[in-house]
Swiss-Prot record:
Species for this entry: Rattus norvegicus
Stated name of the protein: Sarcoplasmic/endoplasmic reticulum calcium ATPase 1
Gene Ontology process terms (BP): apoptotic mitochondrial changes; calcium ion import; calcium ion import into sarcoplasmic reticulum; calcium ion transmembrane transport; calcium ion transport; intracellular calcium ion homeostasis; intrinsic apoptotic signaling pathway in response to endoplasmic reticulum stress; maintenance of mitochondrion location
TM region positions: 49-69, 90-110, 254-273, 296-313, 758-777, 788-808, 829-851, 898-917, 931-949, 965-985
Keyword match Nucleotide-binding: yes
Modification type Phosphothreonine: residues: 441, 569
Protein family membership: Belongs to the cation transport ATPase (P-type) (TC 3.A.3) family. Type IIA subfamily.
One cellular-component annotation, GO: perinuclear region of cytoplasm
Tissue specificity field: Skeletal muscle, fast twitch muscle (type II) fibers.
EC number: 7.2.2.10
Binding site for ATP: 353, 442, 489, 515, 560, 625-627, 678, 684, 706
Amino acid sequence: MEAAHSKSTEECLSYFGVSETTGLTPDQVKRHLEKYGPNELPAEEGKSLWELVVEQFEDLLVRILLLAACISFVLAWFEEGEETVTAFVEPFVILLILIANAIVGVWQERNAENAIEALKEYEPEMGKVYRADRKSVQRIKARDIVPGDIVEVAVGDKVPADIRILSIKSTTLRVDQSILTGESVSVIKHTDPVPDPRAVNQDKKNMLFSGTNIAAGKAVGIVATTGVSTEIGKIRDQMAATEQDKTPLQQKLDEFGEQLSKVISLICVAVWLINIGHFNDPVHGGSWFRGAIYYFKIAVALAVAAIPEGLPAVITTCLALGTRRMAKKNAIVRSLPSVETLGCTSVICSDKTGTLTTNQMSVCKMFIIDKVDGDICSLNEFSITGSTYAPEGEVLKNDKPVRAGQYDGLVELATICALCNDSSLDFNETKGVYEKVGEATETALTTLVEKMNVFNTEVRSLSKVERANACNSVIRQLMKKEFTLEFSRDRKSMSVYCSPAKSSRAAVGNKMFVKGAPEGVIDRCNYVRVGTTRVPLTGPVKEKIMSVIKEWGTGRDTLRCLALATRDTPPKREEMVLDDSAKFMEYEMDLTFVGVVGMLDPPRKEVTGSIQLCRDAGIRVIMITGDNKGTAIAICRRIGIFSENEEVADRAYTGREFDDLPLAEQREACRRACCFARVEPSHKSKIVEYLQSYDEITAMTGDGVNDAPALKKAEIGIAMGSGTAVAKTASEMVLADDNFSTIVAAVEEGRAIYNNMKQFIRYLISSNVGEVVCIFLTAALGLPEALIPVQLLWVNLVTDGLPATALGFNPPDLDIMDRPPRSPKEPLISGWLFFRYMAIGGYVGAATVGAAAWWFLYAEDGPHVSYHQLTHFMQCTEHNPEFDGLDCEVFEAPEPMTMALSVLVTIEMCNALNSLSENQSLLRMPPWVNIWLLGSICLSMSLHFLILYVDPLPMIFKLRALDFTQWLMVLKISLPVIGLDELLKFIARNYLEG
């Protein structure tokens, strides 16, 4: 049944053709079950494990590597002699890399799907219904409840479906619906229709929502919707429909991969075509087919050389290290790739309650009457420090500390706060903080009593557990609470009836203490308390009191005000009818006004500084709250989202105002606005969509089930540590301390991580460019192989991987939070950088080939062949006069390969030093600023020595140990790369960056 909240109870009953007393007939139940289906959220149809595995191989680079592995595997079958071990190592290693990558990918995907399953925990198991086949109420499984069922709920129950309340069987019915609406206090329900068909969930005061909890009272209602049609079901559908987008870096790497695969394909084809004339060379035994296979192997080597196999592992390691650093700052990252996305966040949409504020109501102002002279009335106004439930803070008058006990009015005010109250404070020893037990508003009053300490109780020697309620206990010993007249909507107040304790001399007779909404309480006051006397309440005095309350309730503070009053001579206990709440108003008459307290959910101390940091970093902060607009704007002014006197007409909207705008203006509003009040979860998703249409990268916070769709849709969903399991599983990050400042720290970390990733991605790619140039040159010039795939894999994975990982430890730039967020479209490698890598890569390739050629042409222990013989080595046979006196086996010697590999590794170590900074010289930023990098370079070189000097590794890698002169040559060829890069950095600094 749609819009059940706007219908009367009679309309709801007749819509389903049911009576409130008997319930549905078995026949109706059957029909409704067929029509509406069972009352449960369908399980999510997740992808099968096989589908997830196949998805990991949709990447072009992965497919090229897979093809290369298959081809090498086939070729390895046909190898003979010693070669076979080496030949099988290569496809085996490639497959291992691919399997490892696929496992990581599948694991991450699996995590993402748990969000929808977590909604299940809010499904109630059982429900209590009235049906025509039984006289009394019966318990049935919640999934069997159908629309039209008459359901009974009582305190402690979980609501089994969306229910329109028919009758309330207790004084009040309070429901905790924070999981759905994010409201921090429980909501009082009623049975009257809510005439607005577009009312937000917070305003549907006659509805109970599936999955919420009954906090107090008992009621009977009719089921309006079940299963997916309930509010929680709609949330599930929104989540199921939300597709996860790739992070900016993932998109960049995908684009890069596609370009790279096209380039690889072109180069492979080019190498084949250049050498097509060599297919018949004698070295292949004159067989065209074997020649083709040989060049096929070179093409495979090229593919292996061009793909940075170590990159996924290095990125994962760097992100994992980043998440550890973030965890120390209370930001727990659930999805690794999102660490980098944080770096380009341009908008943070934050909840107000608990994130920007402490979610700990605290009294910050109060007043009592100072004196009344005819119609002239003066007040004593006080402010109170401290913004949490901790019983620490001072009472100030005119900004100077005062002792509350010296004001009689404050003693009585503290008495009312302590007695007209069912809550208390509790010191949580594991967390080391004070927490509320009971309602937030009442706990604020309990804390106020502790701060006031009107009877000068000795509290310094008490432990924190004893300190929690010390002053309240003293007051409660003086007066004994007999009974409570519960809060009700019509009188908007509650009261307690107290009698003096036996030993007490303080109070003379019985008293009634009242607290409630100021207008309601003051209307029932005939007197005001001045010191210890009472004075009749006149019109002008009442006006003065109401004007201060109005001033506190609007303007900068927008405090929530409570009036406190006493009935000095209440009726006798036995004359009061306590089970008829309609009579409560009569008993709370003839009151004496004592004072007013103003409370708010105060902003966190560190938030103002964080918002300024965001402003400096070019990040817009938008506050989104279910609170009313006045309170929202006031908090925005307090924390610096709006300045004190800024005009906010087109920068703050309620959910309703936003909906009333035409679509184009809604989109425009999201571009300007910094405050949305009275919003529903669906608005959050809409706001994220509009922001994304402007290419903004949005971080969205939330803690309730209702926030889950928006958390899933935003690039960065941020759940609160105290939030629901659904919100946590739908998010990328969880704030352990629920603190807005933690988000800003995480953004800073994200920016630093991205900068470091840029450095090592570029470092690894320039290494691959060098390898490709090397293989291309050997093939184009007709030289013997300088590097084989197994060696390339070793370099890409191990020797390059270690320094690349260490580059992730580069210290962040000092001005990292003074720059605007980078655009997600900013390329990883721009024009000039591309030229730089080609230049460095060209040098690496030429140096590697040069080192191999040097051994053939000039080395003391080399064969001293001529350049012509070297470039035509394929025609070498015993009968060819050009190669007289030369053993053709020499062209397959391991020494030139060892020279080439050693030069490649040494140059890469120099390149790692070059990558310490994008444009800073090594003289300005010396190697020891990143001690990890120096360590990893030493480790990489040690591993290189390992494969050169420790058997049987040289045989597997086809290498031979080098002597001192050969190592000197390696250094001579390698070190100039530092000079070359310094020159390119100098040009970039002085001529390209203005």
